[in-house]
């Protein structure tokens, strides 16, 4: 995740799209997880599949990761530059039905960055998807306050 000013740089539409400056694209997905299968894996395998240490969240060295680790394939590195999104996961559960998962939301300056990340996850066999199933997915455009004002005034 970007931090500080990078959050704005990667999460908010800039001057390149003047009609929508300060807006954002948001992509939301609901995933259900097979936690029994995940927990059956040794911690070392879980770390290889995610690409990070389980308890410290420190990124593994490239040679320690599975080639289809989540943090390897869920990237957009066009033109040798890492393109980022602002992301967040929130857990949910329906204990009576044994359902557990996360809601993912990502904010992006450019929708195609999120699209590329998702395409890579599904075409490069992201190891996380062996244990997580996407249930829903939605794309939203979030207008800036100026754009909302223009709509309210009948200018757009």
Q: What do the PLM-derived regions correspond to, one by one?
A:
Residues 1-156:
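Long, histidine/aromatic-enriched segments associated with O2/redox biology
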């Amino acid at each position: 995740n970007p931090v500080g000013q990078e959050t704005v740089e990667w999460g908010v539409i800039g001057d390149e799209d003047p009609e929508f400056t300060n807006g954002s694209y948001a992509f939301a997905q609901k995933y259900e997880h097979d936690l029994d299968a995940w927990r059956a894996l040794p911690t070392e395998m879980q770390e290889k599949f995610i690409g990070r240490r389980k308890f410290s969240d420190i990124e593994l060295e490239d040679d320690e990761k599975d080639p289809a680790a989540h943090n390897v394939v869920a990237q957009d590195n066009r033109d040798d530059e890492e393109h980022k999104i602002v992301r967040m996961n929130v857990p949910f559960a329906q204990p009576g039905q044994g359902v557990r998962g996360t809601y993912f939301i990502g904010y992006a300056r450019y929708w195609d960055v999120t699209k590329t990340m998702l395409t890579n996850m599904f075409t490069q066999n992201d190891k996380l998807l062996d244990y997580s199933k996407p249930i829903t997915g939605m794309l939203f455009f979030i207008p800036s306050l100026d754009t909302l004002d223009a709509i309210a005034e009948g200018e757009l």
